[in-house]
Regions:
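Internal, active-site/partner-interface "lid" segment
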Residues: 124-153
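Helix-adjacent hinge/juxtasegments
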Residues: 45-85
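Glycine-rich phosphate/diphosphate-binding loop of Rossmann-like nucleotide-binding domains
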Residues: 1, 5-24
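Conserved small/polar residues in nucleotide/adenosyl-binding loops
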Residues: 155-160
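A short beta-strand-loop structural module common to alpha/beta enzyme folds
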Residues: 28-39
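Short, glycine-/small-residue-rich phosphate/pyrophosphate-handling segment
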Residues: 89-135
Length: 160
C-alpha cells in the first residue's frame, strides 16, 4: 500500500515516527510535508496529499499538524477526498468502515506517538462495509461533485 504523508512544522517528529511505523507495516511512504521546524503552511501539505489521493498517485493519505484540523480542512477542499480528524482509534476505525475515509488527520499537539500509531493501525486495518453506508457515501460524493444535494422524498427514509 502506498501512503502519502504530509505535515507542518509542528509535526515533523511525529511524521517521522509514523513514516517509520508505516514502513514497518510494509507500506511505501511518500512525503509531501516539511522536514524542518521552520514555519510551514499546513494547507500546502493538506492539498498535496489530497491531490495525490484523488489522482490515485497514492492509496491513502495521513496528515499531521498541531491539531489535525487545519490540514484536514485543506485536504477536504480537494474533490474526492474524505478526510477525518481522529484523536482516538475507535473513530478512526469507524470512519473507514462507515464513511470510507481516504485521508486520516491528527494533531501532534493532541496525541502522542504511541496513540498515533494505534489510530493509524485501526484506520488502515478497517475496511469499508458498504451496504447502507454506500448510499450515504454516495450522498457525500454528490455534494462533492455538484456542490448540492437532491434528496427525493421517497429516498429519504428514517434509516437515512
Amino acid at each position: 500500500m502506498k501512503i502519502g504523508i504530509g505535515n507542518d512544522h509542528a509535526a515533523v517528529e511525529l511524521k517521522n515516527i509514523i513514516s517509520e511505523h508505516l514502513k514497518e507495516r510494509g507500506c511505501e511512504v511518500v512525503n509531501f510535508g516539511t522536514d524542518t521546524s521552520e514555519s510551514f503552511d499546513y494547507p500546502i501539505a493538506g492539498y498535496k496529499v489530497g491531490k495525490a489521493v484523488a489522482n490515485g498517485d497514492v492509496d491513502l493519505g495521513i496528515l499531521i499538524c498541531g491539531t489535525g484540523v487545519g490540514i484536514s480542512l485543506a485536504a477536504n477542499k480537494v474533490e474526492g477526498v474524505r478526510a477525518v480528524v481522529c484523536s482516538e482509534p475507535f473513530s478512526a476505525k469507524l470512519s473507514r468502515m462507515h464513511n470510507n475515509t481516504n485521508v486520516l488527520a491528527f494533531g501532534a499537539r493532541v496525541v502522542g506517538s504511541e496513540l498515533a500509531k494505534m489510530i493509524v493501525d485501526e484506520w488502515l486495518d478497517a475496511e469499508f462495509e458498504g451496504g447502507r453506508h454506500e448510499r450515504r457515501v454516495n450522498l457525500l460524493n454528490e455534494i462533492d461533485h455538484t456542490r448540492g444535494l437532491k434528496v427525493r422524498s421517497e429516498e429519504h427514509t428514517s434509516e437515512l
